[in-house]
Amino acid sequence: MSNLNNLTSKILNDAEEKKKYILAEAEAQKDKIISKKTNRAEADKEEIITKANIEAEVKKARIISNAKLSVRNDMLRAKQDVISKVFNEAIEKLQNLSNGDYKYYVISTLDSLELEGTEVIIINEKDKDIFSNEFLEALNKELESKGKKGSITLNMEGKFNGGFILDRNGIQINNTFEALINSLRGELEFEVNKVLFD
């Protein structure tokens, strides 16, 4: 019986040893899995934080860029408004020329156009006192003295503020103040911008 007890005891001891070994193996495996999962979670966390930081920087840069662009556009719009105001004031100054200066502008402009003497000068109703019959007669006499026809006529139906339009056989040459300033605007805008904002 003692052999049986020894054998039973040995089996129980072996089983206990095997159990301890299996439990130790399982514990080691558990620790290994937990460590691996913890490391993976830590790496994932770092990756997520890095991506979030990159996305935040990109978003921040985009917001700053959009804000700068918006400010730039607002400044350009404000500058353009100021420049437009300057050109509009120039038109107003031309519209407020004295009668003598206004006539001088018209006469010097007409002299530069090489008139045939049969054209129609279109003016607005407001300027009819400046361009009287005496003015027209003097202009036609001057043209006749140059060997041209002296039959220029006036049309007071212009829908513009200041200046005139010369109609030569249906072809109109626009010498209104608005047209004059607008034709010069492209050339002068850069210079006006420099004077105003530099």
From Swiss-Prot:
Keywords assigned by UniProt, alphabetized: ATP synthesis, Hydrogen ion transport, Ion transport, Transport
GO BP terms in the entry: proton motive force-driven plasma membrane ATP synthesis
A GO term, aspect molecular function: proton-transporting ATP synthase activity, rotational mechanism
UniProt entry tagged with the keyword Cytoplasm: no
This protein's record includes keyword Iron-sulfur: no
GO cellular component term, pick one: proton-transporting two-sector ATPase complex, catalytic domain
Similarity section: Belongs to the V-ATPase E subunit family.
Function: Produces ATP from ADP in the presence of a proton gradient across the membrane.
Protein's UniProt name: V-type ATP synthase subunit E
Organism: Clostridium perfringens (strain SM101 / Type A)
